[in-house]
Amino acid sequence: MKKRLDYERSSGNVFVDIGFSSEEAEELGVKSRLIGAINETVRRRKLTQVEAAKICRTDQPTLSKILRGRVESVTIDRLAGYLTALGRTVEIRVTPYNARVKAGHLVTVA
């Protein structure tokens, strides 16, 4: 006899799925993608965390926490600053006003 698996359809945002508000989830999603870009850049440049931290003007323990996903104490602005220090260009684009949209969104494309 086959077991029936129960599942729940995803909202499309893992942070909403685990209970964060949509606003918190949006911010956490942006931070996650920026951290992913930082990790990728450090890896591609073959930097140690100590070297990367020096470039980003922070210390290795702080950078390590961030790279492991501890995002509560870091801002999107700081993450963008780390990326630019590492040689990446961070673009911020504001789209035109749309009266049909209740609220705008934070979106990252990395």
Label each residue range with its predicted role.
Residues 42-44:
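Short amphipathic helical patch at the helix-1/turn junction of helix-turn-helix
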Residues 1-36, 97-110:
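N-terminal flexible/basic segments that precede or flank functional cores
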Residues 47-64:
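Short alpha-helical DNA-recognition segment
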Residues 30, 34, 59-63, 75-79:
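Amphipathic alpha-helical interface surfaces
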Residues 76-93:
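DNA major-groove recognition helix of helix-turn-helix/homeodomain DNA-binding modules
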Residues 67, 94:
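DNA major-groove recognition helix of helix-turn-helix
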